[in-house]
């Protein structure tokens, strides 16, 4: 399951994200890279939870910045 989720993130990074016309994430690493790293480090359940929390923080009213996977 983890590998499938990681493949979906890579698909998004490679084929869908470029359609947005440039970087739009407020964080470093980007939200999709954060999701990929969280899945690789923690597995499907905790990695998905961390990724969802991160995406919910990525909005115009949050300052963003450096936020690595714990």
UniProtKB/Swiss-Prot annotation:
A GO cellular component term found in this entry reads: plasma membrane
Identify the keywords attached in UniProt to this record, alphabetized: Cell membrane, Membrane
Annotated membrane topology: Peripheral membrane protein
**Subcellular location, principal:** membrane
Q: Which NCBIfam families match?
A: membrane protein insertion efficiency factor YidD
Function comment: Could be involved in insertion of integral membrane proteins into the membrane.
Q: Which family does it belong to?
A: Belongs to the UPF0161 family.
Kindly provide the name given to this protein in its UniProt entry: Putative membrane protein insertion efficiency factor
